[in-house]
Amino acid sequence: MVLMIVSGRSGSGKSVALRALEDMGFYCVDNLPVVLLPDLARTLAEREISAAVSIDVRNMPESPEIFEQAMTNLPEAFSPQLLFLDADRNTLIRRYSDTRRLHPLSSKNLSLESAIDKESDLLEPLRSRADLIVDTSEMSVHELAEMLRTRLLGKRERELTMVFESFGFKHGIPIDADYVFDVRFLPNPHWDPKLRPMTGLDKPVAAFLDRHTEVHNFIYQTRSYLELWLPMLETNNRSYLTVAIGCTGGKHRSVYIAEQLADYFRSRGKNVQSRHRTLEKRKT
């Protein structure tokens, strides 16, 4: 059974995540004190029910040791996973302005901007040990819920999930990435007028890139690097490995290479997911 701990900065989508988990059959509790986690888990273990609990600045333990002790006291039947939701500062400010809600730390006479920064510092101990960090800056409510359903329901228990995501550097580096590879030095299909409207998912773009030796070398060396360290990552009790591939716009080279890497590791029996940030953004 899974004990999903949902944390993150206020305004990043924790309530949406908790509702999505409830729809998936999790027993959900909002803002349960950390010290009560073992008691809740023992009660649900008897009923064989997975649980999801949100933790934010309102119920953060006074020290990281309290959280670690609570995790140690969980029943063996439960596999704890920590999901941390985040968004960039400007997005959080906009969301609070749109909803006109009060930030949890604003009561301490802090401005909204200062409250967001203070909260980030307070939550860093949880963020640093998260199994999965999700950047919701570019996501709608429905996209976040669907992404969680895909990643969590499609995940085999206790097995590392490899996530390959393409992005464009002009849109910023994904904050949920464990590894970032820059492919802007590779031949660019953008300069071919016939290929420019296409994406790395289209066969003509794939054929263009496939003709270049340096593209093959990059894919080979990148997958070799990941294969070298993957056994250690798998034994490090982590649930996700997110590999971000970036080109200028996130439309051609990064998409193609992310798909090539995803296909390779999928063919080796790994649990693999792929995501294309720029292409998903264009659909909205």
UniProtKB/Swiss-Prot annotation:
Residues the entry annotates as binding ATP: G8, R9, S10, G11, S12, G13, K14, S15
Pfam family for this entry, one: PapZ_C
Record keywords: ATP-binding, GTP-binding, Nucleotide-binding, RNA-binding
Molecular function GO terms recorded: ATP binding; GTP binding; RNA binding
Cysteines joined through disulfide linkages: none
SUPFAM superfamilies in alphabetical order: P-loop containing nucleoside triphosphate hydrolases
Stretch list, region RNA-binding: 266-284
Domain of life of the native organism: Bacteria
Binding-site list for GTP: D56, V57, R58, N59
NCBIfam families (UniProt xref): PRK05416.1
Record's function text: Modulates the synthesis of GlmS, by affecting the processing and stability of the regulatory small RNA GlmZ. When glucosamine-6-phosphate (GlcN6P) concentrations are high in the cell, RapZ binds GlmZ and targets it to cleavage by RNase E. Consequently, GlmZ is inactivated and unable to activate GlmS synthesis. Under low GlcN6P concentrations, RapZ is sequestered and inactivated by an other regulatory small RNA, GlmY, preventing GlmZ degradation and leading to synthesis of GlmS.
Family: Belongs to the RapZ-like family. RapZ subfamily.
Subunit-level organization: Homotrimer.
UniProt protein name: RNase adapter protein RapZ
Organism: Escherichia fergusonii (strain ATCC 35469 / DSM 13698 / CCUG 18766 / IAM 14443 / JCM 21226 / LMG 7866 / NBRC 102419 / NCTC 12128 / CDC 0568-73)
